[in-house]
Structure formats: structure tokens, C-alpha cells
Amino acid sequence: MAEITVELVSVERMLWAGQASIVTAQTTEGEIGVLPDHEPLLGQLVENGVVTIQPIDGEKLIAGVSDGFLSVSKEKVTILADFAVWANEVDTASAEADLNSDDELAKAHAEAGLRAVRRSSEGL
């Protein structure tokens, strides 16, 4: 099976690095799926989107991301996000409360996290 190297990095931490069969991300141009040997491109992530990684070995990984870039070469995908959180790390009750916050950053992070949770529960 063909593989592509993937790195998902936020301002705060490296979330994941490894080999995957496909990566999907929501960009300002639409949702994109990246397979090995994809044509090089640079994309801007949407404000509150979802990144999905299918590792070669293991379960599908789903992260909520907010702002940033997606860099694709034939061998590697690098996702640099201002904020990223795994769906299974999201405290749903706290995130839902943050949706009503006056703090725009907290609201954006909550929206990204909840989108990841929804995507995860849909099994997509």
C-alpha cells in the first residue's frame, strides 16, 4: 500500500507524525483528500475545520483545527494549524458553553473541537 508522510502541528504542540494512506482537510477552496504522489500544493485551512488522517496502522484520527496551512508534496503532507485538538480530547460540555463566550478565540476553538467530535461520531 502506498504511504505518505504526515505531520499535524499546532502552535502549542506536535499532534501527530507518521505514515498514512490518506489525509483530508477543509481548506478555503473546499475539502481536499491527499493521497501519496499528490501534486504539490499549498492550501489555507478554514477557520474551524476538521482534519482526518488514516494511518497505515491503526484507527482513523480526527482533529478539529482552526486557521493555518496545508503544505503538500509528493511524499509529505504538513498541516500547520493555529489551534488543533483531537476529537477524543474535547470536553463537549465545556466546548458547548464556550460557544456562548464573548472571547472569540475560545469560541473558535470550541467550534473546531465540536466539529471534530461530530465528524468522529458520524464515522466519516
UniProtKB/Swiss-Prot annotation:
According to the UniProt entry, its GO molecular function terms are: ATP binding; proton-transporting ATP synthase activity, rotational mechanism
Keyword Ion transport among UniProt keywords: yes
Its transmembrane ranges are: none
Q: Which UniProt keywords apply?
A: ATP synthesis, Cell membrane, CF(1), Hydrogen ion transport, Ion transport, Membrane, Transport
The UniProt record lists the keyword Ribosomal protein: no
Localized where? Answer: Cell membrane
InterPro entries documented for this protein: ATP_synth_F1_dsu/esu, ATP_synth_F1_dsu/esu_N, ATPsynth_dsu/esu_N
Pfam family, any one? ATP-synt_DE_N
- Signal peptide limits: none
Topological relation to the membrane, as annotated:
Peripheral membrane protein
Give the source's domain of life in one word.
Answer: Bacteria
Give the GO cellular component terms, alphabetically: plasma membrane; proton-transporting ATP synthase complex
The record's subunit annotation is: F-type ATPases have 2 components, CF(1) - the catalytic core - and CF(0) - the membrane proton channel. CF(1) has five subunits: alpha(3), beta(3), gamma(1), delta(1), epsilon(1). CF(0) has three main subunits: a, b and c.
Family according to the record:
Belongs to the ATPase epsilon chain family.
Task: Say what the protein does.
Answer: Produces ATP from ADP in the presence of a proton gradient across the membrane.
- Give the protein name, as stated in the record: ATP synthase epsilon chain
Q: What gene is this protein translated from?
A: atpC
